[in-house]
Amino acid sequence: MKIALGIEYDGSRYYGWQRQQEVKSVQGCLEEALSKVADEPISVFCAGRTDAGVHATGQVVHFETSVQRKDAAWTMGVNVHLPPDIAVRWVKTVDEGFHARFSATARRYRYIIFNHRYRPAVLANGVTHFHYPLDEKRMHQAAQCILGENDFTSFRAVQCQSKTPWRNVMHINVNRYGHYVVIDIKANAFVHHMVRNIAGSLMEIGCGNQDINWMAQLLALKDRAKAAATAKAAGLYLVAVDYPVQFDLPCAVMGPLFLADDLI
């Protein structure tokens, strides 16, 4: 039997998604909890491996098991065995052709900037603080040049292991909600640090350090050294993963929960 789960987590206490020896990972905690409920070893596969300090409200995983359990066991039952900063949001039995990573057609991220003179305490690990005023309209206008299929070498981590820097960005929007500036981006896939590198450069434009056309120039240069520094991990959330309609996976509010449910 193959089962898919929707997972939410605060990544600030973890060394990323991927299971590692001697350090705490989200995957490791989830597999341990699932194995207790299944009473057999469980290995999970995810839609996107997030880095240390990165969060998710819409991570999707799948696993295979030989045991029969009620849906409540895979949600509330597993949550009992998880730390408070990881939670299962939904469960769905899927057909054998489903794969959390390879069946996905797009991933969506939100980068949350707390744009205020003073840094936050309660959400210190849930947002990126930027104390200079940001012009979100300039940021949105500048970002539109990356739509479509492009070579993202300028926004790709040096250690990225992807075979190609080409990705297809389906939308990127920058909006303000009070003191929060939200960069919302969806693409077929992302190269390593792509969202955080884009966010770092957009903040340079938003505060007036760079012109609106700087993003287009960076894209054309294909040189990581020319772009801004990588933005912090704290503000980044994997909020949704798209799949073909045939799998009929549940929908959940993208969040994060401290933002309004009806964001654009």
UniProtKB/Swiss-Prot annotation:
Pfam assignment, any one: PseudoU_synth_1
SUPFAM superfamilies per UniProt: Pseudouridine synthase
Catalytic activity: uridine(38/39/40) in tRNA = pseudouridine(38/39/40) in tRNA
Membrane-spanning residues: none
Active site per UniProt: D51
Keywords tagged on the record: Isomerase, tRNA processing
Family affiliation: Belongs to the tRNA pseudouridine synthase TruA family.
Quaternary data: Homodimer.
PANTHER family: PSEUDOURIDYLATE SYNTHASE, TRNA PSEUDOURIDINE SYNTHASE-LIKE 1
Name used for this protein in its record: tRNA pseudouridine synthase A
Species whose genome carries this gene: Photorhabdus laumondii subsp. laumondii (strain DSM 15139 / CIP 105565 / TT01) (Photorhabdus luminescens subsp. laumondii)
Gene behind this protein: truA
